[in-house]
Amino acid sequence: NRINKPHRQDLYDRLSSLTCGNISLQSAGHELKYPGLDFVTYDRHYDNLSNLLSIKRNFQTSMFSLVTESQYEERFGIITEKTLNAIVAGHPFIVAGHQGCLDDIKGLGFKTYPTIFNEEYQYFENDERIDAMLDLNGAYFTRITTTALHDLVDEHRDIIDYNRDYFFDSFGPDRLEWLRTQLLNIWE
C-alpha cells in the first residue's frame, strides 16, 4: 500500500493489539520506496515491477493475505493489483475494501473463501465494515496454529489453483471481451 488511507490506518491500529503474525501498515513491514506520489512523478519514476519484487518475500513467508484495497468509502470501488497479487501468490484472502468488494471479485470470475472467512462483513456500512470483518473473523485467526493454518490452505488448494490459473489463462481475455461488449452496446 503506497498511500496511507484512513481505513488502512484504522485496520492497522486494531490489528496492532493482536499478538499474531507480522502486522504492519505497509506491505508486511516494508515501507515502499515512493509513498504518496503525484501522478506525474509516479508516471515518470515509479517502478511497479521493482515494487512488486520487493514484497515477494512477504508473500512467500505468509499463508494468507488481508488486503486493504485502494477504495473503501466509495460506493463503487475497483479491485486493484493488491488483490491480484494475493491471487497470484496463491493466498487465500480477505479484503478491506468498498461495500460488496468480495462480490465484485467474484464478478470478475475469481472465487473467494467463504469456508475460511465469514464474508458478510462486506455488506456493512463504511463505519462498521472493518469492525464487522474483525468481529466475524479475528478471533479464529488469533488462535489458529501454524499446522492448522497449513492444513486450511491445503484444504482450499482447489480454489487457490483455480484463481491462479484463471488469472493467467482467462482473466485478460475475459476482461477484453467484456470491454468490447460494453463499447458495442454504447454505439448500437
Give the ranges of each region predicted by the language model.
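Pol beta-like nucleotidyltransferase catalytic core
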Residues: 1-67, 73-188
